């Protein structure tokens, strides 16, 4: 069975389903690396991607974001000139009630009898305005970090926005963007 469309799992409409000790056959996380780049250096700017609304991000999308952003930054900035961190973890267990289709499906299918479903994957639950991922860079590489965030936002189920912070944590997005456009 193939991967279902992401629009099925993107809404936060069901209660949290995370207690793995009660779930038989819960899959393991596909994403295992959450910090990439130069982890020990200090950088001038922090660029973070925030969720515009509450959503669930499947682990496949998180892994795709991780690979894409890390590859883009390594190629354009260099491994020692950035620190990239994914700030969410896929705890939510997704489940599916497999429906039998085809000839004589009524003989061996259960339909809606006991429809709770079997675990098929994991997702990260994100609240409105929560940071999803962060890149720390210096001033010369800020435009590459913004492009990486734009590319990462395309892989999310709902829209997202980025914010730029200085070392003290002050939001300086409008100030930095106004100087970059000149």
Swiss-Prot record:
Q: What is this protein called?
A: Large ribosomal subunit protein uL16
What HAMAP family does the record point to? Ribosomal_uL16_arch (MF_00448)
Coiled-coil ranges from the UniProt annotation:
none
The family this protein is said to belong to: Belongs to the universal ribosomal protein uL16 family.
Identify the species of origin: Thermococcus onnurineus (strain NA1)
SUPFAM superfamilies assigned to the protein according to its UniProt record, in alphabetical order = Ribosomal protein L16p/L10e
Name any GO cellular component annotation. ribosome
MF terms per GO, please?
A: structural constituent of ribosome
- Tell me one Pfam family matched here: Ribosomal_L16
What Gene3D superfamilies would the database entry show?
Ribosomal protein L10e/L16
**UniProt entry keywords in alphabetical sequence:** Ribonucleoprotein, Ribosomal protein
Q: Which GO terms describe its biological process?
A: translation
